[in-house]
């Protein structure tokens, strides 16, 4: 008994904030065929899956989400903290690929 959930296209366009291009994200992409995105703090796995499929025209197999706490930083005598972030590790189905380095056409 699976229910089809409709997400508004406007909401889906706002869910993905940016792709994560780092050494760890590149390693994960090569080894596990996953892509890493920064997402909105209140985004659900189903919204992330729908947003990736809508924006990049690929099929998503699964989504894992990690909440990352912001680091404590100090400037002089003032303490501060960087923002908390939420990352989505999106596993694509075999044969699917998202390439951020090629030019948009």
UniProtKB/Swiss-Prot annotation:
<comment type="subunit">
    <text>Part of the 50S ribosomal subunit. Contacts protein L29, and trigger factor when it is bound to the ribosome.</text>
</comment>
<dbReference type="InterPro" id="IPR013025">
    <property type="entry name" value="Ribosomal_uL23-like"/>
</dbReference>
<dbReference type="GO" id="GO:1990904">
    <property type="term" value="C:ribonucleoprotein complex"/>
</dbReference>
<comment type="similarity">
    <text>Belongs to the universal ribosomal protein uL23 family.</text>
</comment>
<dbReference type="GO" id="GO:0005840">
    <property type="term" value="C:ribosome"/>
</dbReference>
<dbReference type="Pfam" id="PF00276">
    <property type="entry name" value="Ribosomal_L23"/>
</dbReference>
<keyword id="KW-0699">rRNA-binding</keyword>
<keyword id="KW-0689">Ribosomal protein</keyword>
<dbReference type="GO" id="GO:0003735">
    <property type="term" value="F:structural constituent of ribosome"/>
</dbReference>
<dbReference type="InterPro" id="IPR012677">
    <property type="entry name" value="Nucleotide-bd_a/b_plait_sf"/>
</dbReference>
<comment type="function">
    <text>One of the early assembly proteins it binds 23S rRNA. One of the proteins that surrounds the polypeptide exit tunnel on the outside of the ribosome. Forms the main docking site for trigger factor binding to the ribosome.</text>
</comment>
<protein>
    <recommendedName>
        <fullName>Large ribosomal subunit protein uL23</fullName>
    </recommendedName>
</protein>
<dbReference type="GO" id="GO:0019843">
    <property type="term" value="F:rRNA binding"/>
</dbReference>
<keyword id="KW-0694">RNA-binding</keyword>
<dbReference type="GO" id="GO:0006412">
    <property type="term" value="P:translation"/>
</dbReference>
<dbReference type="InterPro" id="IPR012678">
    <property type="entry name" value="Ribosomal_uL23/eL15/eS24_sf"/>
</dbReference>
<keyword id="KW-0687">Ribonucleoprotein</keyword>
